[in-house]
C-alpha cells in the first residue's frame, strides 16, 4: 500500500481529493446577498486552482488554523502541517455552512479593490457595455476592465503585457499571497482574464430598495417583522400610499430657510427641551430644603464677612437672585465688580481650608441628586451636547479657569437656577478639587508664592495702565463670564421677545432652560466683543464697562489696541468715545470671515448699523447658505465633537516654553531702545473657530527700587522675588499662549529696525520628518490685518506680517470607547491626556533648539543692534538656554523658559544663574512625579443619536450661526493635511484671500474642497427608505424585548382559547375562537423570526439594499455570433436599474422635485427594476420583455430549477469514475451494502483492474490488459470481486439537500442493470422505488476512501444532522405489519358464500326464536343449529368472545385473515356508522334486526338493543389487544 500511495495517490489533482489540512472558505453569492463561511477542517482542494472551483461564489483562502494550536505560539506552520499529515485525530471535525445577511459595506467590500496609487474601483457608474465599433469595454460600465479585470491574460487596456515569473505563477496557483501589479496608465490589473468570471461589481443605489425575497415570499418576512399586512407593506414600498410618519421625517430633511424670528426660534427649541416639566416634581420636593440651605448660606456669608475670613465679593453677590433685585443702581454694581484682592491676605493653609470646606458643601449639596436625576434627564433630552458648550470656551478665555480654579475654586455663583448644573462643569472643566489643593500645598514652602495667585488677567477691554496705576493690587477675575453674559443676553433677548416684562432680573425656570440652550447661540455671536449691546440695554453691563474702562493713568499716555468688532468696523469706532481719545482702535479683519466671505452678504459685512440691529439678520444670511456651508465643512460629520480647554497648574505655567524665542539674538522682537513694549497675543480656539478673540498689548512693569538701589546689588532671594512678583505675571501669559495648540508670533517694525519676518509667499507646510509633529505656517499680508504704532517713521512704516504656527500631534485623539473611562478618571483625580505635554515640548525642543534660525526670523540680528551693557554681553547666552541644551542631550522633556527683567533706566537684561539652577531641577523632578496638567485639547466623544433628525438639524443650526467659526482647523489639519507631502519642497498652502478652493492642495485636501452639497448623504423617506428608518429601531436589545413580550403573550392567548372553547355556545363565539387561532399562528410565526434575529444579533436593516451586486461579466456575456450580437438578459436588467437610478438622483438634486410625486414615481420605477432583476414579473410588477414580447430571464430563473445554475452546472456536472442507474429495492441486503450491476462495475473499476493486472504481470501493456479482460470473463469476474472488496462507492441522489444525500456503501455484484438499495436507507436520500435514479462515484485516493469508511458509511449516518433525530427507522416495516394484521382480503369471497348458504336453507333466520329468561334477557342459541351452519374449514363461525377466537387461531383451526363473527355489546368504530343498512328484518312478535355489511344488531319490540354480532378477523383482534395493553401500560 505504501508504494501504491507514493506512485499514484500522493499528489492527486482531482475534484474529490481530501487532506487533513483545514482551510477556511468564505464565499459570497451576489443574488442572495448572503455570506457563506465554510469551515472544513478535513477537506480542501489540494492543488486545484481556486478559480476553477467557484462560479458564483468568491472564495478567499486563509492560513490554515487548528483550534487546538491557537493557544501555542511555538508551533511553526511547517510543524503544524507535519502534524496534520501524520494521521487523524479528534481535532478533525466538520463544521457546517453558516449563512447570514450581507451588509451594504460587505457587498461593497466584495467588489472594491484599491490600487497602489490610492484609486478605488468597483462601482459601476454607467450603463454602457462595449463600444459599437472597437468592441472595447466602456470605462465604468458593465464590462469595465478596471472593475472586472482584463480581457486577455496579463494584458491591460493599453495593450501592454506583463506576465508574472514562473515563481510568482506558482505562488498564485498555490494560493500564496503575492503582490498585484497594475498598469500605471490605464489602472488595469495584470492578471488572468478568467478573473472576469469571479470579480463582482456593485451599483450604489441613490435610494434604498427592498429585496424582493423578503417581502413577496410566503411568508413575507418584512410583513412579519413589522406586523403589517403584506398589501399595506407593498403599497409603502411602491409609493402608492403615504404613511403619517413620512411627512414628519420629510420635514426634518428640509434644509431650506429656517424661521429666523426670535419667537419662532424660542418656540422651536421649546419643543425639544421639556426639562421644565420633569423638574417640577424635584422642585416641589426640594423647595423647602433649598430655602433652608439658602438661609444657612446667607448666615455663613455674613459670619465669614464679620470674621474677615473672606471678602464679600467672593460670594458673587451679583448673581444672587435676591441681591440683584434690590441693587439696581450703577454704584452698587460697579462696587460688586471691583477686584477681589482680599483673598491674598490669607495664608496658604487658610485658603486650602476654605477651598476644601466649600467644595465639600457643594459636593454634598449637588452631587447625589445631580447624578441620579438631572444627569439622566439631560441625556434623555439631548442636553449632553448642549451642555458641552458650557465647558472651557464659553468662559471666553483660556486663562479664566486657571485663575478661577486657584482663587475661588468652587465659588462660582450662588444663584439657585445655576447651581443645579454645577457638578457637571466641576467634572468636565475643573477636574478634581483635591488635585488643586495638593498643587497649592506643594508651594507652601516657597517664598512669595502669593504672587502666583496674582497673575494679572486682562478683562475683555482693559486699559494697559492698570499695571502701572494699580501695580500693588492683585487683580482677579471679576465674575464667571459665561453665565454673566448668558444672563445678560437672555435679559436682552426676552426683552425683545416680550416688552411687557419689567423685572428681568428674576428668570423663570423655563427662561433659564432656554438660556442654557442658547449657550452656543451666545458663543457664536461673540458677545464679549460686542458689549455695547448690553450697555444700551442693561445697567449691569454698563457698570461693567465703567469698572474696566475707567482705570487710567493720565500721566502716562499709552495706547491700547483692541480687536476689531466681529461684524463692523463702525461699531468699535463708535465705541471710541467711551474710552480715552488718545487710544487707537485697530481694525483686524477676521481670518475666518475672510475665508467664508463668499457665504455671507456683502451688505451685512459692510453695514454701518449696530450689532443690535443686525443680530438676527445674520440668521437669515446664514440660513440661506446653510447647505453650502455644511457641505464645505464636511469633516464635521467625521470628527468627534471637540472642545478645547487650555489650562495648567501652578508649578508648570512657567515651563510652557518656546525656548528659542528668548535667545539674545531674537530678543529684538520684544525689546526696544527707547521704550520697552512687549506685544503678545493670546489665541483661543472655540469649538469651530479660527479667529482671534483678543489682541492685547502689555507694558512691562517698570521696576523702580524705592531706595534707588541698582538691581545688580540685590541678593539672590530678592532677585528671585523680583522675578516672580513683577515680570513673571505678564510674561507667563505670553509663554502659555505659545504652549497652546495654535500660537501667534507678532512682529513689529520699530525705528531703525529691519523687518524680521520672512517673505509672505514662503509660507506653507514645514514638515520635520524625524519628529512626531507637523507645523503649518501661514502668512497674512494685508495692511488691515495688523495695527501699527503711529510713532513709527513714515518711511519705515511697512506692512506688518504675522505668521501662524499650528502644532499638530500625530497621536490619536480620544476615542469614543474611552470617553466613559475619562469621566471616571477625572473623578479619580486624574486627567487623561490625548497627547501629553511631554511629547509636545520634546517636539518643540527638537524643532527650535537647533543653532540655525527659526523660519520666522530669517535675518539675523547682531548684538550691536541692542544697547547692551558688559554684564549683559556676558550673559548673551543665558544659563537657562544652556540648561535646556543639557536636558535635550539627556532626552528629558520639560524645559524652562527665559525670563528677563526690565528697568526704566535702560534695556539691561539680567539672567539669574546662581540661585535658579538647583531650584529648576527640583521643579522638574516635581513635575515628573506629580503634575496636574490638562492638555490643550479636550475631545468629547460625540456618540449620541437623536431620535429625530430635526433635532440634529437644529443642533447644527444653533451651533453654527456663523459658519466661518463652524470649521475646526486644528482637527481639520490633523485629519486632512498631516499626510500631505509635496515631493518638491514639502510645502502646502492653506487658503487664499478670497477663494478658499482656488489654491492647489494634495489629493485628500482637494477632494475636501471640491466636495459639494450633492455629495451630502440624504435619507429618502419614500418607499424602502421608510422601512429602513423603521428597521433602525429594531436594535438587538429591542428585538430581545419584543421576543420576551411575545413569549409572555403566547400563553395568555392559549389560556384564552381554552376558556372560549369551554364556554362556546353561539356562532359568534366560534368566529372569535377562529380569530384567536389566527392571532396565535401569527404570534408563533413572528416569535420564531424575532428569536432568530435576536439570538444571532443580526441587523434587520441589511434586508434593505443600498448597494446592488453586479455579477461578473463572464456570467452575463455579450458575444459576436455570425455577425450578430448575442447578449445575456441580465445586462438589460442592470442597464434599466442604472438608468432609473440616475433619474432618481436627478430628481433628488432638484429642490423642486425632491419632495414631490415625481421622486416617488422614480423610486417606484427603481424598486420595480431591482425586483425584475431578482425575479422578473413577480407579483403585480410588469415583467421585462424582449422585442418578441417574451419575458427576460432574471437571476431567479437562472438559478432555480433543474435547468438552473446550481443543479444543471454545479451539481449536475459530468465527472469521471461515475455512473447512473435506476434504483430498486433490495431487502436482502445489509444496511451498508448496495447492489452494483456487473456491467457498470466493470466500467467503473477498469483502471483498478488494469493496474492490478500490470502489477501482477498478467499482461505487459494496457492494451494487453484490456484484451485479457474481454477474452476471459471468469478471470474478469474474479479480479473484479477482488478489487471491489476494499473500495467503497458513493451513492448520490439529486437533489442533494443535505450531507446525507452522499453516502458510502460496500458494492455487491449483481445481475441486471439496476442498482439495489436497502429500503431503510431511502429516507436519507428522500428516495423511493418508483423510477428514481442514483449516481455512483468512486473515491480514488486512500484519504478519500478512509473518510468514506469513517464518515460517510450508511451505518455511521443513523441520525439526522439537522434535528438529531433518527433518520433510519423501520417505519415501512411497521406499517406493513399493521396492514398485514388488519387485512380483510377474504371479505368479498365470504359474503358471496354466506348468501349462497342462506338461500339453500330457505330461511333467513337459521336460529330459533329467542327466549327471555327473567331480567337477564339472555339470548340463547340452540346447539343443534351449529351443525347446519357448519362450513368446510370452519370458514363461517360464531364465537362468544375474543378469547375463543384466539384459542381457535392457536389451534390453527383458523388463520389471521379468516372472517369470524363474534358477539360484542360494546362500542365499535366501523368508520361507516351512518351508512344505509343492507337489510332490515321484522319478526311477528315485533322484534327486528338491522343487518350491516360488518355487523348485525338485534332489537326487541320496544326498540331496545338485545345483541350485536360483529364480523372481524383474528389479526384485527390481536391488534386490538396490543393497543389496549399499550394504553394500560
Curated annotation (Swiss-Prot):
Which cell locations does it reside in? Answer: Plastid, Chloroplast
Q: What InterPro entries does the record point to?
A: DNA-dir_RpoC_beta_prime, RNA_pol_asu, RNA_pol_N, RNA_pol_Rpb1_1, RNA_pol_Rpb1_3_sf, RNA_pol_Rpb1_clamp_domain, RNApol_RpoC1
What reaction(s) does this enzyme catalyze? RNA(n) + a ribonucleoside 5'-triphosphate = RNA(n+1) + diphosphate
* An example molecular function term from Gene Ontology annotations: DNA-directed RNA polymerase activity
Superkingdom classification of source:
Eukaryota
Please state the Enzyme Commission number of this protein: 2.7.7.6
User: What GO CC terms are in its UniProt record?
Assistant: chloroplast; DNA-directed RNA polymerase complex; mitochondrion
Give the top-level enzyme category.
transferase
Keywords from the named record: Chloroplast, DNA-directed RNA polymerase, Magnesium, Metal-binding, Nucleotidyltransferase, Plastid, Transcription, Transferase, Zinc
- A Pfam match: RNA_pol_Rpb1_2
Could you mention a single GO BP entry for this protein?
A: DNA-templated transcription
Function according to Swiss-Prot or TrEMBL:
DNA-dependent RNA polymerase catalyzes the transcription of DNA into RNA using the four ribonucleoside triphosphates as substrates.
Relate the assembly described in the record: In plastids the minimal PEP RNA polymerase catalytic core is composed of four subunits: alpha, beta, beta', and beta''. When a (nuclear-encoded) sigma factor is associated with the core the holoenzyme is formed, which can initiate transcription.
This one is known as DNA-directed RNA polymerase subunit beta'
